[in-house]
């Protein structure tokens, strides 16, 4: 556990933050299309290489979350992307969930998937240079959402993910995101977000 503490402290040292650069290929394609740049693997690499080569990286960024494609790429001079990020003093993270799908028993709410085969993927990501990970749970909010089913199912998935990540020697970022969409009040948002977070803490406590 001391090694995990060391990783967490290094990411947040001197008030630094985390750069989320884990856009999927589809999202990157939309961004490049908006500036009339063809989205192929090389152009996506050039974009990220330029971003991670900034002199400000060492001043502001303690960790960078990558997408599966990116952690496997090499720069024009032969460095791996993780090596480029490490050279600025930042640590490499990786998004490990595989996206949200409709939750069984619900017509609208979602469950984040990716637990199948996760232990093996984590071991590979560690060898590729990752030292922390991210998993995002998504919750709708309305007069009837998030339901007890959604809250408990996503909390359980987040807790299992976190336990596997720590087993692999990495720090898990747990991201329970209650979406802002809707006409609910700030009070309702606070109440339901608190319920989600409390359930996540409870689930994590059972696996550690």
Where on the chain are the PLM-derived regions?
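Hydrophobic residues within beta-strands of alpha/beta enzymes
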Residues: 64, 133, 172-173
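Conserved small/polar residues in nucleotide/adenosyl-binding loops
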Residues: 207-208
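Conserved, mostly hydrophobic/aromatic
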Residues: 40, 135, 174
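Alpha/beta catalytic barrel-like cores
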Residues: 1-128, 141
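Alpha-helix N-cap and loop-to-helix initiation/capping positions
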Residues: 39, 110-117, 146-157, 184-196
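Alpha-helical scaffolding segments of alpha/beta enzyme cores, especially the outer helices
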Residues: 49, 120, 124, 153-167, ...
């Amino acid at each position: 556990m001391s090694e995990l503490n060391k990783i967490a402290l290094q990411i947040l040292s001197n008030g630094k933050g985390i750069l989320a650069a884990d856009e999927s290929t589809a999202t990157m394609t939309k961004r490049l299309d908006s500036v009339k740049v063809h989205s192929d693997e090389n152009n996506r690499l050039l974009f990220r290489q330029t971003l991670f080569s900034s002199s400000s990286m060492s001043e502001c960024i303690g960790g960078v979350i990558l997408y599966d494609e990116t952690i496997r790429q090499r720069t024009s001079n032969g460095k791996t992307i993780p090596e480029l990020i490490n050279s600025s003093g930042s640590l490499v993270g990786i998004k490990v969930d595989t996206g949200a799908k409709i939750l069984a028993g619900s017509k609208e709410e979602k469950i984040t998937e990716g637990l199948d085969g996760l232990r093996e993927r984590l071991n590979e990501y560690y060898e590729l240079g990752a030292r922390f990970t991210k998993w995002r749970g998504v919750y709708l909010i309305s007069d009837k959402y998030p339901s007890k089913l959604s809250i408990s199912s996503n909390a359980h998935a987040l807790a299992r993910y976190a336990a596997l990540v720590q087993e692999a020697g990495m720090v898990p970022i747990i991201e329970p995101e209650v979406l802002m969409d809707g006409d609910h009040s700030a009070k309702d948002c606070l109440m339901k977000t608190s319920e989600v977070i409390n359930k996540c803490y409870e689930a994590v406590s059972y696996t550690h």
